From Swiss-Prot:
Protein name: Uncharacterized protein aq_2005
Biological source species: Aquifex aeolicus (strain VF5)
InterPro entries the UniProt entry points to: GCV_T_N, TrmE/GcvT_dom1
Origin organism lineage: Bacteria, Pseudomonadati, Aquificota, Aquificia, Aquificales
Top-level taxon in the UniProt lineage: Bacteria
Cross-referenced Pfam families: GCV_T
Amino acid sequence: MKWIDLKRSKIKVYGKPVKMLMKGLTAPEEHTHFLHGLLTNDIKSLKPYTFNYNLWLKQNGQPIADFFVYKIKDYYILDTEEPADFVINEFNRLKLSLKVYFEDLTPNYKHVFIYGEGAEEFVKEKFGVELSDYEIKELKEELTLRKIL
């Protein structure tokens, strides 16, 4: 078993549910609508405690950044190699009048990738959890674990 300490930014994206679904909104929350329109993968269909991989593209289709988007309860966490302040500044510029808010969680999270023979057993023994593919578990609201195929 081996592990790597990854240097990745974590950004919380949240908002409030809309009272009435207005024309043009694709989701009942403005933050879901914002991310769904901005990123390449389906954000609306994410269930709580699941995630998917997304690209943020320029108008000509070139990638600006890539993200893992985690849905946690009624908010999202963006996991990216890009600096959090860059992403937050650009997203604030793009959100227009939508009530979408961003918070830099990078100082609150440590991202450790555990892999190799015995990794699943280590996680089960140390944290007491088993993970399915593309599943997230929150432990004491401080640690989020994930497993990819």
